[in-house]
Amino acid sequence: MLPMITGFMNYGQQTLRAARYIGQGFMITLSHTNRLPVTIQYPYEKLITSERFRGRIHFEFDKCIACEVCVRVCPIDLPVVDWKLETPIRKKRLLNYSIDFGICIFCGNCVEYCPTNCLSMTEEYEFSTYDRHELNYNQIALGRLPISVIDDYTIRTILNSPQIKNG
């Protein structure tokens, strides 16, 4: 009879210990209820990017002097610059400029070292496509300015994001 009583006491202690562990886990879960959500509903909500965000490169054809500094400072020699030497005036004339964003690592060296500031980073980061050859942008595609997330009325922007507060 005595072993049966001690068995019930051990069972009761184990039950209380299990209830305490479950309660501790539940308290941790409840402590997360007053935090802001981490995820956003992507196609309908977008984060406002920071000022120094490195998105798609914008190119101004008229400012470029075809010096090829962007190609020399690029770690992967990515920008393709085609030019022709105009012999009467002894200057280079830019024919074509293209960047393949499927290969680009968005380091920003080309933008930083461009002597004429014809390159700049935009806030556009959506490059989804079914064909990777569509990511090769020529000077016409690079010259288009993207629609700002703030100006697009179909998208709700998220200002109270933990990433923006911390970064």
Curated annotation (Swiss-Prot):
What does the entry list as the binding residues for [4Fe-4S] cluster 1? C64, C67, C70, C114
Q: Where is the signal peptide?
A: none
- GO terms for molecular function, please? 4 iron, 4 sulfur cluster binding; iron ion binding; NADH dehydrogenase (ubiquinone) activity; quinone binding
The record's GO CC annotations read: chloroplast thylakoid membrane
Q: Which residues bind [4Fe-4S] cluster 2?
A: C74, C104, C107, C110
The cofactor named in the record is: [4Fe-4S] cluster
User: Which keywords appear in this protein's UniProt record, sorted alphabetically?
Assistant: 4Fe-4S, Chloroplast, Iron, Iron-sulfur, Membrane, Metal-binding, NAD, NADP, Plastid, Plastoquinone, Quinone, Repeat, Thylakoid, Translocase
* Predominant location: plastid
Output the PANTHER family linked to this UniProt entry.
NAD(P)H-QUINONE OXIDOREDUCTASE SUBUNIT I, CHLOROPLASTIC
Can you tell me which family this protein belongs to? Answer: Belongs to the complex I 23 kDa subunit family.
Q: What is this protein called?
A: NAD(P)H-quinone oxidoreductase subunit I, chloroplastic
UniProt organism field: Aethionema cordifolium
